[in-house]
């Protein structure tokens, strides 16, 4: 976040005499004029150019203090009343902010238990057919005669009579207000009270092999909040201790990694015994403490090997059975898919050549080996953008590389698929970046796009400080035409900002990065996903309200203000302050803004989306006929016939001087991925990604 603060009443605004700064020129310090403002107060030798140069790039959807787990948005919370963890059922103790609470479903939990929540947030929309994965609770209003705590939020069920509801099937007790946010997973064990262990067990003949890999979410046994765990493996019962084997002790750790292997030569008398796995806490001065256990019969091990996570149980329970860790939602959804697959026995899935685009032959398929990666020219949360030269040609491309493991772990499979679909649209205006092709390897997705030599507008704003109104109009017109195209096809962009507006070699606009875009959103059809870049997000997004394509026009108004003022209309030291200002403050304009500029920006920055310019059915007509664009020939603009005010300086074919040094100094090496994770990755999730754009090939 840029080092900016919202000025208090009485802060100075830019005087009307300040001209637009030329590259390298110094703008006079603010302070020559006085008046109320919501702008950054610039004093001393500071100026707009230096402010823009020091401004940091902001990524989309970066929220501090939040943990995203299975759709839950866990924020740090101070609990005033006695509260129990909804995962491990222990008391949430401590001073200050003791635990986490989901902002969607109010699920309370220890910070240490947060990452072990296996069910999806009931308050968040899911993409799959949720009705097929529901096992609903049977709630009955109940009067409790003893103190009882809510199994959802962890607070006391208060009152004299009918304090809460109880599930007649699984005995879950919750508040009346909490029953709507309880996940529909009646009967499913979704907690790991004692932790879990990852292991592999295989029985071949009389040889039993046990691989102890790692444990997680173990219970703290020492006063320092940690444990000193080790794993004990033996055949049970075994009073002599003949078969007992132990791993090394991992000190002060609740998530130890062991990676040890044990082998057993089974005797005939062992055939009726069970393989017992226990976790113990080692103590130097006293007796070791039991932490958890589970066991397997040799009969079940003979049928098939055991490979995966298993929950630790109590000492009595662990001697008799085991419980595998499963994602209940995904497990039911998997069974649903298997049933649907069985209903269509004659429908054969296309599994061969799944990396090959559907509209080209195998001989012409694009591969990563076809390119020489020259420089890094961009970077995001999922991957990076590389300048690439196609081998054997003079063709230069911008190749966006995304890691599959990051996409899967963040449950964002729809993002690259949406981006590919939008980049492949036909009849697109010249102000949307063109895609040459997209392909995949075992661990990455690749978008091959046209190379925009001029860099992004963030870089150019850092050089100029701010633009004259005529320059701002030029860029606003070309960006608006790109948005018209998307909105007329029911696509909301959701990430309009300086970083995502590139210039080609002539200086015309190219809108890039459609990862957050979504189809099926109109002026009436809404969506609720909280996403975007903080300074550009509309009030309805910040408030978690349903929003439509009108949210894009709010971002457009912020962008227009930024063009001419050299800063965003709503600043703050952190996201919380920025969001509060977006919802409550009004934009205050520098004195050099024209009446038409203030009018159109005010119309775009209307808090109520239904009253916002661009929100109605006639958005194109209302925007193009506004007095701010009175001198614009929109037909010439759409034909790319307007003269760009800034022509990028390009010294040679591979010149990257128009890109941020923070990117170009990085190595082009691709970050290694987790090989074990990639081996278990279902590549079927990416079938249909690869594509060759016939329109781009025609241009070449």
Curated annotation (Swiss-Prot):
Q: Where does Ca(2+) 1 bind?
A: 222, 228, 281, 283
Regions that span the bilayer: none
Q: What is a GO molecular function of this protein?
A: calcium,diacylglycerol-dependent serine/threonine kinase activity
| Triggers of expression | Up-regulated in the midgut epithelium in response to bacterial uracil.
Chain residues that bind Ca(2+) 3: 283, 286, 289
Q: Which cofactor does it need?
A: Ca(2+)
Give the residues annotated as active site: 495
Present the record's domain note: Tetrapeptide ligand at C-terminus is tethered to inaD by interaction with the second PDZ domain.
The protein's name is Protein kinase C, eye isozyme
Q: Which organism is it from?
A: Drosophila melanogaster (Fruit fly)
Q: Which gene encodes it?
A: inaC
């Amino acid at each position: 976040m840029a080092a900016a603060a919202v000025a208090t009443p009485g802060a100075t605004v830019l005087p009307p005499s300040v001209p637009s700064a030329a590259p390298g020129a110094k703008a006079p310090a603010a302070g020559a004029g006085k008046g109320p403002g919501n702008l950054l107060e610039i004093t001393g030798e500071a100026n707009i150019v230096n402010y823009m140069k020091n401004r940091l790039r902001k990524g989309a959807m970066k929220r501090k203090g939040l943990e995203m787990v299975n759709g839950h948005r866990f924020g740090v919370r101070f609990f005033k009343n006695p509260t129990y963890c909804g995962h491990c059922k222990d008391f949430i103790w401590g001073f200050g902010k003791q635990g986490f609470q989901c902002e969607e479903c109010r699920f309370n939990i220890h910070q240490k238990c947060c990452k072990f929540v296996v069910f999806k947030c009931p308050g968040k929309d899911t993409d799959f057919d949720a009705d097929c994965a529901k096992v609903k609770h049977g709630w009955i209003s109940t009067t409790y005669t003893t103190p009882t705590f809510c199994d959802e939020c962890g607070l006391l069920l208060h009152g004299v009579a009918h304090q809460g509801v109880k599930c007649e099937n699984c005995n879950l007790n919750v508040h009346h207000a909490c029953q709507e946010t309880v996940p529909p997973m009646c009967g499913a064990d979704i907690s790991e009270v004692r932790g879990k262990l990852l292991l592999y067990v295989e029985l071949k003949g009389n040889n039993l092999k046990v691989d102890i890999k790692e444990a997680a979410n173990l219970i703290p046994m020492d006063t320092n909040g940690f444990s000193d765990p080790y794993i004990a493996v033996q055949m049970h019962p075994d009073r002599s201790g003949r078969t007992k084997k132990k791993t090394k002790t991992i000190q002060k750790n609740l998530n130890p990694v062991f990676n040890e292997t044990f082998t057993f030569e089974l005797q005939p008398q062992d055939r009726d015994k069970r393989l017992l796995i226990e976790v113990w806490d080692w103590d130097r001065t006293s007796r070791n403490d039991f932490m958890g256990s589970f066991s397997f019969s040799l009969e079940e091990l003979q049928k098939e090997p055991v490979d995966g996570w298993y929950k630790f149980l109590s000492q009595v329970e662990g001697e008799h059975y085991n419980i595998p860790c499963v994602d209940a939602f995904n497990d039911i959804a998997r069974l649903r898919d298997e049933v649907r697959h069985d209903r269509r026995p004659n429908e054969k899935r296309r599994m061969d050549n799944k990396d090959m685009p559907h509209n080209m032959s195998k001989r012409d398929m694009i591969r990563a080996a076809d390119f020489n990666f020259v420089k890094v020219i961009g970077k995001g949360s999922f991957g990076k953008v590389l300048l690439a030269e196609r081998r054997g040609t003079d063709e230069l491309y911008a190749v966006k590389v995304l890691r599959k493991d990051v996409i899967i772990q963040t449950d964002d499979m729809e993002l690259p698929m949406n981006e590919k679909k939008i980049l492949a649209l036909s009849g697109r205006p010249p102000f949307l970046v063109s895609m040459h092709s997209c392909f995949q390897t075992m661990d990455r997705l690749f978008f091959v796009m046209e190379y925009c030599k001029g860099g992004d507008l963030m870089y150019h704003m850092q050089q100029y400080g701010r633009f004259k109104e005529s320059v701002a109009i030029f860029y606003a017109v070309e960006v608006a035409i790109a948005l018209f195209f998307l909105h007329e096809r029911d696509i909301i962009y959701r990430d309009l900002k300086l970083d995502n507006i590139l210039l080609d070699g002539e200086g015309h606009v190219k809108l890039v990065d459609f990862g957050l875009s979504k189809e099926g959103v109109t002026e009436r059809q809404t969506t609720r996903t909280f996403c975007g870049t903080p300074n550009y997000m509309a009030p309805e997004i910040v408030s978690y309200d349903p929003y439509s394509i009108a949210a894009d026009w709010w971002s457009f108004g912020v962008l227009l203000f930024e063009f001419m003022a050299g800063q965003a209309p709503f600043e703050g030291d952190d996201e919380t302050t920025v969001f509060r200002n977006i919802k409550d403050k009004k934009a205050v304009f520098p004195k050099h803004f024209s009446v038409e500029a203030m009018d159109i920006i005010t119309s775009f920055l209307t808090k109520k989306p239904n009253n916002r310019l661009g929100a109605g059915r006639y958005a194109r007509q209302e925007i193009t006929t506004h007095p701010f664009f009175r001198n614009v020939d929109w037909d010439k603009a759409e034909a790319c016939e307007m003269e760009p005010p800034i022509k990028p300086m390009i010294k040679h074919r591979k010149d990257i001087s128009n890109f941020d040094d923070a990117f170009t100094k990085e190595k082009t090496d691709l970050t290694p991925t987790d090989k074990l994770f990639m081996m278990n990755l279902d590549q079927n999730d990416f079938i249909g990604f690869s594509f060759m754009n016939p329109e781009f090939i025609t241009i070449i």
